[in-house]
Each structure stands twice: as C-alpha cells, then as structure tokens.
Swiss-Prot record:
Signal peptide: none annotated. This is ATP-dependent RNA helicase DBP2. It comes from the Eukaryota. PANTHER family: ATP-DEPENDENT RNA HELICASE DBP3 (PTHR47958). A motif (DEAD box) lies at residues 241-244. It comes from Encephalitozoon cuniculi (strain GB-M1). The lineage of its organism: Eukaryota, Fungi, Fungi incertae sedis, Microsporidia, Unikaryonidae.
Amino acid sequence: MMHRGYGGDRRGFRPSFRSDRNSRYAPRTRREPQRYDPMPELAPVEFQKNFYQEAESISRMTPSEVSSFRKTNEMIVKGTNVPHPIQKFEEAGFSSEVVSSLVEKGFSEPTAIQGQGWPMALSGRDMVGIAQTGSGKTLSFILPALVHAKDQQPLRRGDGPIVLVLAPTRELVMQIKKVVDEFCGMFNLRSTAVYGGASSQPQIRALHEGAEVVIATPGRLIDLHDQGHAPLSRVTFLVLDEADRMLDMGFEPQLRKIIPKTNANRQTLMWSATWPREVRGLAESYMNEYIQVVVGNEELKTNSKIKQIVEVCSGREKEDKLIGVLDNFKGDKVIVFCNMKRTCDDLEYVLNRSGYGAAALHGDKSQNIRDKVLDDFRSGRRPILIATEVAGRGLDVNDVKLVINFDFPGSCEDYVHRIGRTARGNTKEGISHTFFTVGDKANARELIRMLREANQTVPSDLEDMVRVSNDRYGSRSTRHGYDYRGRAGRFPYRG
C-alpha cells in the first residue's frame, strides 16, 4: 500500500519530495577552497644591502663622544668598523613621513638600541643585537627591513618574500606584523603573517598574491615551503627575533632547514635577550663577519625602570593577596601571569565575580578569541589580562602599569620577559609584583642576584629560603605538581 506523499522503495518510508532540488532536505554541494599550484623557485636577482649615508653631525663625532654615548647607555659593541650611533631620527636617513610618524606615536628620540642598531642594520652588515625586553628592538629591525625591501627589484609572479622575520610564537608574529603594518603603506609594501593555530588557506592566498615582508613561526613556514607555497630564494633580509627563545622551544632543526634556503648573500640580523652558547653557535654557522651590540650585558638582566616587589607566601594565600594588590591599581592595565591554563580560567571567574574586568588568554583559546581578548585589553574594556606564557614574550601593549606573577615561571629568564611587559620603550617606570612560594625555591638564588643587580629590595624570607631546607616551609605536596588551590595537576604548564 502506498501512502500519499511517500515513496515505496525498499529503503523504507521517506518523504517523496526529498529528492526535489529546491527542498531543504536536498543535499547541498560543499564549496571547495581555491587550490593553488606550488610556486617554482625562480632564479635569484641582484640586490643591494647598504643604504646608510652617515649624517654630517655623526661624521663629526669624536671617538670620545662616541665612547661617552655608549658608556652612558651601558652599551658595548663588538666587531670591525662598527658605525657611530645616532641620537636623532633624522640622522638615520628615514623619510620625513617616517620621522613624522615616529614623533606622532610619542617617540622623541631613538632608544639606545635603535640609536646604535639602525646604522648597523642599514649598512648592510650581518649583526647581532642583545637587549632587554622593552628596549625598542622591534623598530630596530623593522624600519631597516622596509628600507631594504623598498629599494629592491619588484616582486615577480611566483617570487617569495624579500624580508623574512622569524619569531617563536604566533602572538609575537602578530605583534611584529602590527608594527610592520603601521609603516608598510609609507613604503608601498605588503606584509603577511604565517603561523600555526589558524587556517593555512588565507596565508597561502596571501603568499601567492605576493608580499615583500613575511613574519612567520618556523613550523608553519616549513610546512608551507614544503608544499611549494613559500619559496625563500628571494629572501635577502633575514631576521631571527628572540633567537634564544626559539632555541629553547626546540626550533633549531627548523631554523637550520629554513636559513640555507634563503639567498646565500642575504643580510642576517639576530636579536636575543641573552647570548648563550647555542645562540652563538647559530650565529657562527650562518652569519658573516657580524658586528654586535649589547645593551646592558649578555647575562640575564631586568629592566632598570621596573620596580620589582617579591612577596614570599603560601599557595593558598595567593588569591587573597592578588585581590589586595589589584585594589591599589583600579583602572590601570594589569597583566597577571599564571603557569596553568586552569588557573587562568579560575582567576578570570573570581575576578569578574568580584567586579574586575578580566579576561584570560592561553593556548586553548582560538585565534579569534585571543584577538578579541587582546583588543579588549588594549582598549581598556577589560583592563586585567590573565595569561600563561603564551603572552610572556613579544606582547607590546601601551600603558601596562603592573605585571603580577601569580605563579613564578619555570626560569628566571621567563621572569625577566614577563615583567618586561611594563615600562617599555621610552615610557616611565612600571611595577612588578611576584608571589614566590617554597615550590619556586630552585630559582631563589638567581632571583636574588637579579634583584640586587637592579638595586631592588630583597625580602628576608627569600634570603632565608636559600639558606634552609624545604621542610621548614611546606609539605611535600607544595613542592610538586599541584596548583595554587592544592589540586593535582601538571606544574608548571605553559599554555
């Protein structure tokens, strides 16, 4: 028996209109993403590297004046024929439009690393820059990179980038791209970012459309290069930003695969906060007669403009102490660093319930949510950012008044970079407040050294921690993988 409106096939009853092409039940064709054929590696083109014309005022500097400038700024240079430092934007040879833009952004003069780094980079030499976080190093390589790219032959169809900047994290990649985009239009150049954790299709499309400047994480760049979407033979200006961090994260094999694929006569710039043996080895392998500038020293050092407060306490006291600290900074931008994603989410709930505008940022967040969180933080809609190590380096937000280490990081190097999110560039002093527990004792001695070197107060409890055994301060559970509320978990975890 056939029922009205139904078909009688062996598959059972179903609406007879199911096959109607206009029916909402009809299968919908899926739109396939546009596919791009691999780009061939084209023959290299001639290029130039030296764009520096020393200003007359710089040429007149006496050796004693040069030495005095470097000594005043705690600067050491190494290598032969290192250019003299500049002290005004105009002396770098940038266009009036670039200089005006720098002034409009609130910069009155180059920072120490820019004053020495710009002449070195613009002269076409391979160079290494060692500088503390917040010193203005991003502009130290971005503006010379744009000058370099602008004065090369135009990109041909299928060419890869002229400038390649490698960075350890997608957050740092996006931050560098933001700085690049502020100046790209003045040079009539295009840039794109290549990083993991997001769809590769828009990145592939941007590479095929052509971009003179590419900022990338090593892993995603290798993937796209191997697929034929990111040829590197046109790269004549290579930057390794936070080289020490990239090696710490295990990117050395990727770096050693990427670098030989660029132009053999390229200019290479390496930037790092420290100068360990591994970074030196990488420089010796791929740089020719490089010159070096060190601002401060090659050892781990904190920014002298940051007032550092270290408070020894137990894990269970942290939450109440955090509220007490935040009460004194209402309305100010504050970054709270934690070691675990779960701690970030817990604190986000606690602080918002208490009336604070807080948002969490960690590795489980999608890129869209991360962008929204950072936009809300920058605008002040949510003035408290709670983050894991994912935001510890490269995050450049204006007017961060306070950095709180709710959890002490796994190393003092990460501590330096965390607190460096405040007092950046030529801005005034910032403050860091760190909660330190017995579980962090392994870092106590190095932390004391850095505090004393920066003329900061060393709490007596911290000194005692170095002298006595762990048993005097806490139970075994406090010293192992438990979070601040005593729950078992992996510690420290950097999301």
